[in-house]
C-alpha cells in the first residue's frame, strides 16, 4: 500500500496549492482510458451530440478564449485560497526556522492566563514567566520609570550607589579646595579684614553643595547649650486632669526660676548628716539607760540583803566550820505572795464558774417555764376554738331543723287546702255510682304518704351528718332510730322519652347539685375560719397557725 501512487503526503499537498494550475486537468487513476482511435475519453454514444459543423468552427479564437477563461478561474481560486490561508499560521515553518523571532511576552502571559493547558505546558509557561521576571530585574532604568520594588532592581541600585559615591567625592573635593583657599588666604595676610572673613563665610553658607552647607551649619552656626534650663529639677511638669475623660492629652507646665526650690549646698547637707548622727547616738544612749538603772537597783538590793549575814558571820570567823561559806536562810516573800495570788485567782474562778452555772440553770428553768406556759395557753385556745365551733354547728343545726319544720307545715297546709276543695260537693255526686266512695277512698288521711321518712337516695345531700353531733355515740343512736321507706309508687315505672335529652338534663342537674354542694362546703369552711378569728380576738379572715 505504500507503493500506491494515490497516497499523497503533505509536501505533495503544498505543491498542489502553491503551483499554478495547468491548462489540462490531471489524469486521475480512476478515470477511464481514452479511445485510441479518436483520442477522446467520452463514449461513442455521446460523440454525435458534441460534434459541430466545420464551417462554424474558429479554431484560433476558440482556443484563445478558452485559455483566458481557465486563467481567470485559476487566479480566482488562488486568491480565495490565499485569503483562507491568511488566517492560519504555519507552525511547522516556524519550528524549522528554530524560533528566530521571539513572541511578545505580554501575549504569552495573556495566553498563559486565558487558555489552560496540560501540566507539562503549564510548567513550561511558569518557567518562562520566572525567567522573564529574572531578566527584567537586570534591565536597569531610573527612579522615575522603574516598575519594580525599590531594592530589587539591581542595576538601578548600582546606578544610584555610583551617583552617591560620585557626589561624596565632589563634596570632599569642594571641602579640600575651600580649606586650601582659607590656608592660602591666612598665609598671605596674617590679619585679614572683617569684610574678607564675612565674604568667605557668606560664600561657604551659600555654597551650591548641600554637604558644604550642612557642615558649615553644624560647625559654626549651632551653639549647643551646656545646660538646658527647662530640664532643671521642678521646672517642667505634666498636668493631668483625672476628672476628665481618659483621652485627654496631659499638658506641660513650665515654672519660673524664682518659683523653684533652692538647691541645698554641700555644706548644708553635711550639717544635716552630722545632726542626724548626733541624735541617733543620744537616742541609743537613752534607750540603754533604763537597763543600767535596773541592774544598779538589783545590785543595791542584794547588798542590803547580804549585810546582816556578813555581820553575823564575822564573830565566828575564828572557828573552822563547814557552813562558813553558806548564808542564813531568808524565806522569800515573793514565792508566798505568788502562791497566795494563785489561790485567790483559783477561788475567784471557781466562784465565777458557780455563778455562771447558777445563771445557766435559772435561764433553763425560765425557758422551760415559758415553753410550758405557751403550750398550756395554746392548748386552752385550741379548746376554746373547738367549743365555739361546736356551738356554731349546733346553732346552724337548730336553724336548719326549724326551716324544715316550717317547710313541712306549709306543705301540710297546701295538702289540706286541696283536699277541702275536692271534698266540696257540687250537688250531682250522688248521680254517679260509686263517686263518693271513690272520692272518699282516694283521700283517706290514713293512706297519705309520709315524705319525711322517704329514702332520698345516695345522690341527695343529707341534711344531717356526722359533724352535726358532738360524739360518735350520738351519731350512732341517730342512725339506729332512722327509718328509710321506699319512694312513692308513682315514681316507679315512669317511661323515659325517646332520645338522650332526659339524660342530658339529668347530667346537667347533677352537675349543678355537685357545684352547689361544693360551694356549701367552701362557705362552711370560710364561716368556721371567720368565727375562729372572731373568737380568738384577732378579727381577721385567716387560718390560725398550729404550733
Curated annotation (Swiss-Prot):
Residues 66-94, 371-427 form a coiled coil. Residues 34-44, 87-106, 330-423 have a biased composition (Basic and acidic residues). Pfam families: RED_C, RED_N. Keywords: Coiled coil, mRNA processing, mRNA splicing, Nucleus, Repeat, Spliceosome. Sequence repeats lie at residues 336-337, 339-340, 348-349, 350-351, 352-353, 354-355, 356-357, 358-359, 360-361, 362-363, 364-365, 367-368. Residues 185-196, 307-317 have a biased composition (Low complexity). Residues 336-368 are annotated as: 12 X 2 AA repeats of R-[DS]. Ubiquitous. Belongs to the RED family. This is Smu-2 suppressor of mec-8 and unc-52 protein.
